Amino acid sequence: MTGRSAVTAPAVEPPAETPCAAAPQRRTQTQRREEAERRLLDAALAIVARTGTVRLTLAAVGLAAGYSRGLATHRFGNKAGLLRALAAHITVKFQDQMRAAPRRRSGLDAIRGHIEVYFGRTDRQWTTTRALLVMMTEGLMDQTGLQADMAAYNRQALTMFETHVRAGIQQGEIGADIDPAAASVMLLGTLRGVMMQSLLDPDIDLAQVRDSVLAMAERSLARR
């Protein structure tokens, strides 16, 4: 600066440097891509829950997620690719809920745990459940192309139940006369059917129904 002469530094101890808050780490390209995909899928989930898949457009998903109209197309290719990814996204959400729940041993105890988590969801608008049921219902229509993807999604859930039914039979807590495949269809169908009714009629007492479903599962599966 002008007019400033050199001076001797004052003989005082300079204050210790206060550690600054660490600057936010710059995200990697992979992290940014993963966040974009998650936001796109969450936006698609909300749209499907509200209006279904038939009128869903990739441009609308991109805009709803806060990105360009073309990003969803760039990421998923087409509508079928988006819906396939959305089914996987719903699976991951449920798996996250299961991991957050108390750990259960395999067999009948694990089946109880899945029922409790299924009925204990905290999403106030039931967006995920509503979107899934809409996708399954619309999968019955040929023009949506959803049937194969929804059947594959169901097989994952059925396989999980079958695994625990077989484990329960081996452990001696589930009857050896129980057919794992049939029992799994019964369990999954019961859960999905109750949720469909609940979305149509919010007055249904899900806590009471949950207790009844747990008791029914015990009675129908337990070794006699």
Language-model segments: residues:
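Hydrophobic alpha-helical connector segments
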Residues: 85, 99-130, 180-187, 207-210
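Helix-turn-helix
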Residues: 39, 43, 47-81, 85
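Short amphipathic alpha-helical elements of helix-turn-helix/winged-helix folds
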Residues: 43-47, 121, 160, 190
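Residues at secondary-structure transition points
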Residues: 24-35, 77, 81, 85, ...
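Hydrophobic/aromatic-rich alpha-helical bundle segments in the mid-to-C-terminal region
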Residues: 145-155, 169-217, 224
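N-terminal intrinsically disordered/low-complexity leader segments
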Residues: 1-35
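Amphipathic alpha-helical segments used for helix-helix packing
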Residues: 110, 123-148
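Generic hydrophobic, amphipathic alpha-helix propensity
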Residues: 33-44, 61, 86-90, 94, ...
